[in-house]
Regions:
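Signature of N-terminal electron-transfer/Fe-S-associated modules in redox systems
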Residues: 2-190
Length: 190
């Protein structure tokens, strides 16, 4: 029995955000990063490089595609299922393309009490994201029909005193009540 191909193992559905991310092609920069990480571990522990390599891929490619899983597995001498286990275990790894502007809304206690759930509802309403298709395990990211915006809940973003807080890509925003959602989105018009 042969091993399943990663595309058979991974649910990487195309989303409207896919148009903002080119297909995965290993770059010279990725090869150099993988080589740098691999020399940090003894030969019998090369699999330890999987996390830093996956973080690099997601940072540069937006998400971890089936092709990226396959490349990582081949580069580390692993079966693709071993890489998929890591990708599917950690909620920070995305298996489908987010929007051009990815919004992470803190949902821990201070932010929840400050209105982060209402903020999430308002962001979804303004961007046309269907919250009923989002869940905390398999599809935590909702993508707008135009592909420009995506939203997901995040655990603590470490600014409890200025709740509710969110991040848009790498930009941090404090005190973003639901009634400020429209102003927030206006800053990120494509």
């Amino acid at each position: 029995m042969s091993a399943a191909a990663p595309q058979d193992l991974v649910a990487s559905p195309e989303t409207p955000g896919t148009k903002h991310f080119p297909p995965f092609v290993p770059s010279d920069e990725l090869e150099a990063e993988a080589a740098k990480r691999l020399v940090q571990f003894p030969d019998d522990q090369k699999r330890s490089a999987v996390l830093p390599i996956l973080h690099f891929i997601q940072h540069h490619h937006g998400f971890i595609s089936a092709d990226a899983i396959d490349w990582t597995a081949r580069r580390l001498g692993l079966e693709p299922i071993k890489v998929l286990e890591v990708v599917s275990f950690y909620p920070g790894f995305r298996q489908s393309a987010p929007g051009k502007f990815h919004i992470r809304v803190c949902r821990t206690l201070s932010c929840a009490m400050g209105g982060s759930y209402e903020l999430m509802e308002r962001l979804c309403e303004l961007t046309g994201i269907d919250r009923s298709k989002m869940d905390s395990h398999h599809h935590p990211v909702g993508v707008s029909p135009c592909g420009n915006f995506s939203v997901e809940f995040a655990e603590c973003l470490a600014s409890c005193g200025t709740a509710p807080v969110c991040m848009v890509n790498d930009d941090f925003h404090e005190g973003v009540a639901a009634d400020k959602a429209e102003n927030l989105l206006a800053k990120y018009k494509p």
